[in-house]
Amino acid sequence: MDFSQFILPEFPEYYIYPTGQIYSIRNKKYLKPRFDKDGYERFSIKNVLTNKIQTIKTHQLVAMKYLNHNNTNGLVVDHIDNNKLNNAVHNLQLLSPLQNTLKYCYSKVQKNGLPSCITYKIKKKIYVFKLKTPECVYNYECKNLLDCIEKKNEIFKKIVKGKLN
């Protein structure tokens, strides 16, 4: 088998497998990931382009190798099944920051069963409010940001009174 297919040019000392495993060619062993404060796997590996040790998340490495992701294209790497530990290429996709935020909003549910964000559309821009209080996700046409904030407050009052429809 030709293992060169698993190498990224900037990290030639490592095999990056489609499963998300990272293998050190020099040390002849799989690297053990560490975890960042948000629960993502990460590795500290040498980047030959900068000649420095770089800490990088596993899903970003896999996306760089198999999805042609670079940090300059404005896209973010998303876990399709929302499992931060499933870094297999078939579970990763590239999304715009807005798409990623909206996916998060509509997929995450608070302990009370309600969504965790609210979105507002003002002209052609969409504003997303992450909620720490119980509010539902709605899409509103707003005249301006102040109008959106007022509508957000109206929704909150209705929820508190138990009259949301």
Where would I find each of the regions flagged by the language model?
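Conserved recognition-core residues within compact binding domains
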Residues: 1-76, 83-164
